[in-house]
């Protein structure tokens, strides 16, 4: 899922 604007985990 999206955590911030550009990175994911």
UniProtKB/Swiss-Prot annotation:
It is found in: Secreted. Its main location: secreted. Keywords: Disulfide bond, Hemostasis impairing toxin, Platelet aggregation activating toxin, Secreted, Toxin. GO terms for molecular function: toxin activity. GO terms for cellular component: extracellular region. Expressed by the venom gland. Potently induces platelet aggregation of washed human platelet and platelet-rich plasma in a concentration-dependent manner. It acts by binding to GPVI (GP6), leading to kinases-dependent exposure of functional alpha-IIb/beta-3 and platelet aggregation, and also induces metalloproteinase-dependent GP6 shedding from platelets. Negative results: does not bind to GPIb and alpha-2 integrin. Does not agglutinate the formalin-fixed platelets, even at high concentrations. Hexamer of heterodimers of subunits alpha and beta (alphabeta)(6); disulfide-linked. Belongs to the snaclec family. This is Snaclec trowaglerix subunit alpha. The lineage of its organism: Eukaryota, Metazoa, Chordata, Craniata, Vertebrata.
